[in-house]
Amino acid sequence: MNRKFFNNLICFVFSIILLTSCIKKKEEDKCLSYAKAPVTKIEGATTASVNQELNLTISFICFNGCGQFGNVEETISGNTTTIVVNAKYAGCICTQDVPTRTTLYKFKKSQAGTYELKFLQTENNYLTHTIIVQ
């Protein structure tokens, strides 16, 4: 009787392991990543009025066809803003091209002054756009 119970217990444990190992994981989480994207061009005005919103067109490179705009990280120090564009890579099978994508960056200041926007290209190398707010 003891041997039969032990065999049933082993079968039960292996059944649980087998069933839980077959649970499908979310496909979208498996092939999703983010990476810093080098900015190649900034287009937009260089002057603005106080509280005027400017739209700057930012061009950046993705490293394969799955790359799209992800988000922007800003670090503000005085009148200088350092901006990092992050590309979002969603998909397991991607073309091996190196596309240039664009996004809008909104700029608005409540005080007059000269503002420097530094967009990351490569580590410690920036593309700078200066805006004078009057």
Annotate each PLM feature:
Residues 11-12:
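Low-complexity, glycine/proline/serine-enriched flexible coil segments
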Residues 2-5, 15-40:
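Bacterial Sec-dependent N-terminal signal peptides
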